[in-house]
């Protein structure tokens, strides 16, 4: 079965797909966002599109106390999207998770252009999963 090139797929889906969110920015400028699962920065562009690129990276929360899921797509099973995702759960502290994400994204020239976006998404998700410390409240000593 012949595969369709990513450039052609992007030309077909860039203006009309179910993940597209169009909003007005400042003035009359339209801003287009994307709700794709494999889009790290949620911007409607060819570089970040999970539909048009064969190699995609996704970082999601696994649950409250379960850590972060790092997903990369296999390039061989493009016609079976559910089977084409490698998922690994990261449960360590942030510094180790950031090393793993950086190595996975840049390793073997997978998608080195997405390293900064992947680390930013990991940082945002890990901050959201962090639990606030409970302890005695500090009192103001000026009273």
From Swiss-Prot:
Keywords, alphabetical: Ribonucleoprotein, Ribosomal protein
One Pfam family from the record: Ribosomal_L28e
One GO location term (cellular component): plasmodesma
Species name: Arabidopsis thaliana
GO biological process, one term: translation
InterPro entries xref list: Ribosomal_eL28, Ribosomal_eL28/Mak16
Gene designation per UniProt: RPL28C
Gene3D superfamilies registered for this protein in UniProt: 3.30.390.110
GO molecular function terms listed in the Swiss-Prot or TrEMBL record: mRNA binding; structural constituent of ribosome; transcription cis-regulatory region binding
Keyword Flavoprotein listed: no
Protein name: Large ribosomal subunit protein eL28y
UniProt family annotation: Belongs to the eukaryotic ribosomal protein eL28 family.
């Amino acid at each position: 079965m012949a595969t369709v090139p990513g450039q052609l797929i992007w030309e077909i889906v860039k203006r009309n797909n179910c993940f597209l969110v169009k909003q007005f920015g400042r003035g009359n400028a339209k801003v287009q966002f994307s709700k794709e699962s494999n889009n790290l920065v949620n911007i409607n562009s060819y570089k970040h599109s999970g539909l048009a690129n064969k190699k995609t990276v996704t970082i999601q929360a696994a649950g409250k106390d379960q850590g972060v899921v790092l997903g990369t797509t296999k390039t061989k099973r493009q016609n079976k999207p559910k089977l084409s995702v490698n998922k690994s759960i990261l449960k360590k502290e942030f510094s180790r998770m950031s090393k793993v994400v950086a190595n996975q994204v840049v390793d073997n020239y997978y998608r080195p252009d997405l390293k900064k976006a992947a680390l930013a998404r990991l940082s945002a998700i890990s901050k959201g999963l962090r639990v606030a410390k409970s302890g005695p409240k500090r009192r103001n000593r000026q009273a």
